[in-house]
Amino acid sequence: MTKARCNPLWQPIPCPLSDIEGLESWLGDMAAQGLVPVTIGQNFARFRCSQPKAVRYRLNAKPAPETFLESAPGTPDGEERALAQECGWYYVTAVGDFFLYACEDSDAPELNTDPQVQALSLRYAKRQVFAPAGLLAYWLVTFWVRYAMGVWHTPVIDFVELGWLSFCYLGLLAAALVSVVHNTVLLYRFSARLTRGAEPERHKNWRKGAGRYLVGRVLAALLFVLTIVWTFAGSAMEKSRHGSIPLEDYTAPLPFATLDDYAGQPTALDADAAPAASFVLVQRLPLAPTFIKYEAHGQAGANGLRGALYVEYYECITPQLAQTMYREGKTNGLHNFPETAADAANGSIYCRTLVDGNKVLRVLLFQYQEEQIPLQELEAICKSGFAASGESA
């Protein structure tokens, strides 16, 4: 053992904590290299240096709490420790829902001599490892119920507009599901082996699959950090309208009717509106390679159109996705737009969702002038340049 390695060090755990046989075998191999565990967390274990020696490690399931409101003990009680010491074993540390014991005497009996009794002791650990699965299932059902009841109005539109961040959320959900299923299968398979009366595998090849497991954990951690950073950065960019162009500076043609088109003449943008309130934002999204967000506040002449126009235009990757977004927009037209519906008390709201192939157009127009544009004229203007079908949302 070199001097550089004599300080306490951390090592990544190469298998899930629910892989009892793999974890016990790995700790035994580390002891053979002169590394004795001090504490074991979810992903890393802390070791201290010692002389290389043969050490057996065994994980004992924590006793189940007496009531639902109580938690499992953090350390074994005196009676359990005394019984272990009589057999030549000593307590090391807690590992999740287990207590870790070690024995340096090769002639000492096993800590657990009856596999079926050991299987019964795993009941609490099995409930604990299954708890995240139940929580995930609860949230998935909750989201589905919210969508079915109309509480979550536009999940597909939200998913498209979030861009790559949506796939980060999906990746985290998939990683959580895989982890929960993997841990549950490992522990239940181990319990079934003990129930049959078979002895645990004392020298399991933990190296098989260790690289794949560690790479998966690293990727999941990186994805989690990326999602957190991206979420906060995206929220800040949305508030600052990062990448948007003031409407007066935007000269490229737009594939939909603008505020000038509805007014029938050039409009003077409202200088009293929030800074950069009138803007155009063009983005490339994974599911909508062309996404244009348009917002304009203004008035045309003394008696012309006075109001605000909000437009979202998508060119989706498939017509099927466009149809789904169209159905959501048709049913929930006012959602996902600025919350200015209260101002309609002094005017009127025109809301429209159109679809044409892989293109979707969502329009929200507020009018506040005394002589308002008739609905038929609004319909004709909205459809101009956009050959679409659909009904007003």
Model-predicted regions and their roles:
Residues 1-63:
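N-terminal extramembrane/targeting module of integral membrane proteins
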Residues 203-239:
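Internal/C-terminal transmembrane anchor helices
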Residues 87-113:
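Extended, hydrophilic extramembrane loops/domains of integral membrane proteins
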Residues 247-350, 356:
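Short, solvent-exposed recognition patches
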Residues 336-393:
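A short, solvent-exposed beta-edge/loop patch
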Residues 129-148, 173-176, 221-229:
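Canonical alpha-helical transmembrane segments of integral membrane proteins
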Residues 103-139, 143, 166:
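Cytosolic-side membrane-insertion boundary helix
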Residues 142, 157-196:
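Membrane-embedded alpha-helical segments of integral membrane proteins
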